[in-house]
Amino acid sequence: MLKKFFIFIILIFTLTGCSEEQPSITVNIDGKSEIIDAETIYTHKEAVTFPAVVRSSGSRPVETEYKGVELTELFKTLSLDISNYDKIAFNASDGYRIILSVEEILEPSNVYLTFERDGKILKSKKLGGNGPFQLIIRRDPFSQRWIKHVDEIILQ
Protein backbone atom coordinates (compact mmCIF):
# COMPACT_ATOMS: atom_id res chain seq x y z
CA MET A 1 0.00 0.00 0.00
CA LEU A 2 2.82 2.39 0.89
CA LYS A 3 4.47 1.66 -2.46
CA LYS A 4 1.27 2.62 -4.33
CA PHE A 5 1.06 5.85 -2.32
CA PHE A 6 4.61 6.86 -3.30
CA ILE A 7 3.95 6.04 -6.94
CA PHE A 8 0.82 8.21 -6.77
CA ILE A 9 2.76 11.11 -5.22
CA ILE A 10 5.51 10.85 -7.86
CA LEU A 11 2.89 10.80 -10.60
CA ILE A 12 1.25 13.97 -9.24
CA PHE A 13 4.58 15.81 -9.02
CA THR A 14 5.43 14.74 -12.56
CA LEU A 15 2.11 15.89 -13.97
CA THR A 16 2.09 19.24 -12.18
CA GLY A 17 5.69 19.90 -13.22
CA CYS A 18 4.78 19.32 -16.85
CA SER A 19 1.83 21.66 -16.73
CA GLU A 20 3.87 24.77 -15.94
CA GLU A 21 2.73 27.61 -18.14
CA GLN A 22 5.29 29.01 -20.56
CA PRO A 23 5.96 32.76 -20.33
CA SER A 24 4.27 35.01 -22.85
CA ILE A 25 3.17 38.59 -23.36
CA THR A 26 -0.20 39.72 -24.65
CA VAL A 27 -0.15 42.68 -27.03
CA ASN A 28 -3.51 44.46 -27.31
CA ILE A 29 -3.98 46.50 -30.46
CA ASP A 30 -7.29 48.18 -31.27
CA GLY A 31 -9.24 45.64 -29.21
CA LYS A 32 -7.47 42.61 -30.67
CA SER A 33 -5.00 40.50 -28.71
CA GLU A 34 -1.88 38.83 -29.99
CA ILE A 35 0.19 36.54 -27.79
CA ILE A 36 3.96 36.54 -28.14
CA ASP A 37 5.57 33.45 -26.67
CA ALA A 38 8.87 33.53 -24.80
CA GLU A 39 10.71 31.62 -27.50
CA THR A 40 9.96 34.37 -30.04
CA ILE A 41 11.52 36.92 -27.69
CA TYR A 42 14.43 34.75 -26.47
CA THR A 43 15.52 33.93 -30.03
CA HIS A 44 14.81 37.32 -31.61
CA LYS A 45 17.57 38.13 -34.10
CA GLU A 46 17.83 41.70 -32.76
CA ALA A 47 18.28 40.70 -29.10
CA VAL A 48 21.28 42.52 -27.63
CA THR A 49 23.21 42.62 -24.39
CA PHE A 50 23.76 46.04 -22.83
CA PRO A 51 25.04 47.52 -19.56
CA ALA A 52 22.67 49.18 -17.10
CA VAL A 53 22.81 50.57 -13.59
CA VAL A 54 20.08 49.50 -11.18
CA ARG A 55 19.28 52.26 -8.72
CA SER A 56 17.06 51.64 -5.74
CA SER A 57 16.32 53.91 -2.80
CA GLY A 58 18.42 53.04 0.19
CA SER A 59 20.82 50.91 -1.85
CA ARG A 60 23.99 51.61 -3.75
CA PRO A 61 23.76 51.58 -7.55
CA VAL A 62 24.49 48.16 -9.01
CA GLU A 63 26.15 47.77 -12.41
CA THR A 64 24.59 44.92 -14.32
CA GLU A 65 24.07 43.60 -17.82
CA TYR A 66 20.72 42.88 -19.46
CA LYS A 67 19.78 41.08 -22.64
CA GLY A 68 16.63 41.98 -24.48
CA VAL A 69 14.96 43.28 -27.59
CA GLU A 70 14.52 46.97 -28.30
CA LEU A 71 10.77 47.55 -28.42
CA THR A 72 10.88 49.16 -31.84
CA GLU A 73 12.45 45.96 -33.21
CA LEU A 74 9.86 43.77 -31.49
CA PHE A 75 7.06 45.86 -32.97
CA LYS A 76 8.67 45.57 -36.44
CA THR A 77 8.56 41.79 -36.04
CA LEU A 78 4.82 42.08 -35.40
CA SER A 79 4.44 44.43 -38.41
CA LEU A 80 3.21 47.19 -36.10
CA ASP A 81 3.63 50.85 -36.95
CA ILE A 82 3.47 52.47 -33.51
CA SER A 83 3.70 56.00 -34.92
CA ASN A 84 -0.10 55.86 -35.31
CA TYR A 85 -0.51 55.74 -31.52
CA ASP A 86 0.01 58.33 -28.77
CA LYS A 87 1.05 56.13 -25.89
CA ILE A 88 1.72 52.55 -24.95
CA ALA A 89 0.80 51.00 -21.60
CA PHE A 90 2.73 48.19 -19.95
CA ASN A 91 1.01 46.05 -17.34
CA ALA A 92 2.68 43.68 -14.91
CA SER A 93 1.35 40.54 -13.26
CA ASP A 94 1.60 42.27 -9.86
CA GLY A 95 -0.78 45.07 -10.94
CA TYR A 96 1.89 47.70 -11.62
CA ARG A 97 1.44 49.78 -14.77
CA ILE A 98 3.39 52.43 -16.63
CA ILE A 99 2.51 54.42 -19.72
CA LEU A 100 5.16 55.67 -22.13
CA SER A 101 4.82 58.09 -25.00
CA VAL A 102 5.48 56.73 -28.45
CA GLU A 103 8.17 59.41 -28.87
CA GLU A 104 10.12 57.98 -25.93
CA ILE A 105 9.83 54.44 -27.28
CA LEU A 106 11.04 55.59 -30.71
CA GLU A 107 14.23 57.10 -29.23
CA PRO A 108 17.06 54.84 -30.47
CA SER A 109 18.54 52.39 -27.95
CA ASN A 110 16.19 53.46 -25.17
CA VAL A 111 13.33 51.05 -24.34
CA TYR A 112 13.99 47.30 -24.13
CA LEU A 113 11.97 44.25 -23.21
CA THR A 114 14.57 42.18 -21.36
CA PHE A 115 14.65 38.50 -20.49
CA GLU A 116 18.18 38.00 -19.12
CA ARG A 117 20.27 39.65 -16.41
CA ASP A 118 23.97 38.94 -16.05
CA GLY A 119 23.67 35.96 -18.38
CA LYS A 120 20.77 34.29 -16.55
CA ILE A 121 17.16 34.08 -17.72
CA LEU A 122 14.93 36.28 -15.55
CA LYS A 123 12.86 34.18 -13.15
CA SER A 124 9.15 34.76 -12.72
CA LYS A 125 7.70 36.51 -9.69
CA LYS A 126 6.53 33.12 -8.45
CA LEU A 127 10.17 31.99 -8.38
CA GLY A 128 11.38 35.21 -6.72
CA GLY A 129 12.64 36.99 -9.83
CA ASN A 130 11.89 40.14 -11.82
CA GLY A 131 10.72 38.31 -14.93
CA PRO A 132 10.02 36.56 -17.02
CA PHE A 133 10.15 39.93 -18.79
CA GLN A 134 11.30 43.31 -17.51
CA LEU A 135 11.00 46.63 -19.31
CA ILE A 136 14.19 48.71 -19.09
CA ILE A 137 14.22 52.39 -20.05
CA ARG A 138 17.89 53.18 -20.48
CA ARG A 139 17.48 56.96 -20.35
CA ASP A 140 15.51 56.85 -17.09
CA PRO A 141 18.27 58.15 -14.78
CA PHE A 142 16.89 56.60 -11.59
CA SER A 143 15.28 53.46 -13.08
CA GLN A 144 12.00 54.54 -11.46
CA ARG A 145 9.86 53.58 -14.44
CA TRP A 146 11.40 50.20 -15.07
CA ILE A 147 8.70 47.57 -14.78
CA LYS A 148 9.23 43.94 -13.85
CA HIS A 149 6.85 41.01 -14.49
CA VAL A 150 5.55 42.58 -17.75
CA ASP A 151 2.74 40.45 -19.16
CA GLU A 152 0.72 42.87 -21.29
CA ILE A 153 1.37 45.70 -23.76
CA ILE A 154 -1.52 47.94 -24.81
CA LEU A 155 -1.26 50.32 -27.76
CA GLN A 156 -3.49 53.36 -27.18
Model-derived segments and spans:
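Sec-dependent bacterial lipoprotein signal peptides
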Residues: 1-16
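N-terminal intrinsically disordered, low-complexity segments enriched in P/E/S/T
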Residues: 18-156
